[in-house]
C-alpha cells in the first residue's frame, strides 16, 4: 500500500515537473524573442509584453492541469483530443464539429466579444492549414474590425474634447454675464454660478485626464500617484455637478413650497452640500479602489466600486425629481388665482430645472444596460458620450442663454450701447424716437423686477422670488 501511495505521489510530482518544464521552454522562447527586439523596444512596450506573457503562461498552466485532471472522453466515435494551441485551451470535440470560444484579451487589437473557431475534421484530427500543413485555429475574426474600432475610439475622443471645450466656453461666458450685470445678483444666481463653476472645473480635469493620462499609455504603465489623484478629483467634481443641481432643486422647493422660511435661507448649507458632501463618496471610493481594485490610474470601469460614486448621484437625482414634481403641483394649485405673467415666470424657472434633471441623469439609468453587438454598442457609445460630455453646454444654454431675465438685460444694454455710440446718428429724429421706444420697452421689461425688490444678505435681488412674496400675501 505504501509503495502504491509513493507511486501515485511520484506520478503527480512528475506531472507537475512536466508542466513546469513546458512553461519554462515557452518562457525561454518568449525571452529570446523579446531579447532580439530589445534595442528597438521601449519600456512601456516591454511592460506590455510582460503582461501578455504572464497571461499566456497562466492560461497554459491552467490548460495543462485541465488536460491531465479531466476524465478521458467516454463517448463512442471519433473525436479530436484536447489540446493547447499556444493561446487557448480546447477540450475533446466530436468529429465534424466546429468548436468556438471568445477571443483572448492578450493583445490590444483583439476584441474579446468576437469568436475564435477550431474545426475537428471527420477523421478525428484537428484541421490543418493547407499552406503550412500544421494544426490551425481561426483567430482572424478577433481583429477583423480593429481598424473600425480604432476609428470609432478616435471619433469619441475628439467628440469628448470638443464637447468639454464648448462647455467651458459657454460656461465662462455665462459666468461673465452673471458677474458683470450686478442687477442679476441674487441667491438663485449665486447657485447658478457655483453650478457653472463646478462644470467648468469638471470639464478642465476631464480634458487633462484624457489628454495626459488616458491617451498616454506610458504614463498609465508606470502608474504614478498623480494620475490616481486626477481620477479622484474627476470623480469628486462629477459628484459636485449633481449635488449643485440638487441645491437648485432644494432652493426652489424652499422658496415656493415652504415660502414662510424663504427669507431665512442661508447659502452656507448649500455650499456644504454642493462642495462638501461629494468628498465623502469620493474618499470612500478611493480607499476601496486602492484595497480591492487597484488598477493602473483607476481608469477601468469594469468594477462595481463605481457605484460608490454613482449611488449618491442617483439618490440626488431622485430627490431632485421629487422636489420639482412637488413644486409643479404647488404652482398648479396655488397660483391659479394669480396673474398669468407671474405664474409663467415661475413655471419657466421650474421647467428649466425639471428638464435638466432627467437629461443629466439618463446616463446613470442607461449605464448598466450596455447592448451587445458591434453596431448597437457603437450607437450606445456615441449617445452616452454626447449626454455625458456636453452637459456643461446644456446647463449654460438652459440656465443662462434661454433665461428671460438674462435676455432682457442683454437686450437693454445692447440698445443703450447702440444709442450711446450713435448707431442712429444719421437722423436726430430717429435717434430720439429710438431712445423713447427703448426707454418704454425698458420700463415695461423691468416692471416685474423693479416693482418688488428684495434685499437678501445685503444685496438688491431683482428676481422672481420677489413676486412670490407678493402672491403669498393673498393667501394670508
Curated annotation (Swiss-Prot):
Cytoplasmic side: 180-190, 254-267, 330-344, 403-476
SUPFAM superfamilies: Family A G protein-coupled receptor-like, Hormone receptor domain
Subcellular location as annotated: Cell membrane
Positions on the Extracellular side per record topology: 34-154, 214-224, 289-304, 367-381
Parts of the chain that traverse the membrane: 155-179, 191-213, 225-253, 268-288, 305-329, 345-366, 382-402
A molecular function GO annotation: adrenomedullin receptor activity
Keyword terms, alphabetized: Cell membrane, Disulfide bond, G-protein coupled receptor, Glycoprotein, Membrane, Receptor, Signal, Transducer, Transmembrane, Transmembrane helix
Extent of the signal sequence: 1-33
InterPro entries referenced in this protein's UniProt entry, alphabetically: GPCR_2, GPCR_2-like_7TM, GPCR_2_calcitonin_rcpt_fam, GPCR_2_CGRP1_rcpt, GPCR_2_extracell_dom_sf, GPCR_2_extracellular_dom, GPCR_2_secretin-like, GPCR_2_secretin-like_CS
Disulfide bonds, paired cysteine numbers: 63-89, 80-120, 103-142
Membrane topology: Multi-pass membrane protein
GO terms for biological process, alphabetical: adenylate cyclase-activating G protein-coupled receptor signaling pathway; angiogenesis; cell surface receptor signaling pathway
Glycosylation sites: 81, 133, 138
Cellular compartments per GO CC: plasma membrane
Protein function: May function as G protein-coupled receptor for calcitonin-gene-related peptides and adrenomedullin. Specificity may be modulated by accessory proteins. May activate cAMP-dependent pathway.
Similarity comment: family membership: Belongs to the G-protein coupled receptor 2 family.
Protein name, per record: Calcitonin gene-related peptide type 1 receptor
Organism from which the protein derives: Xenopus laevis
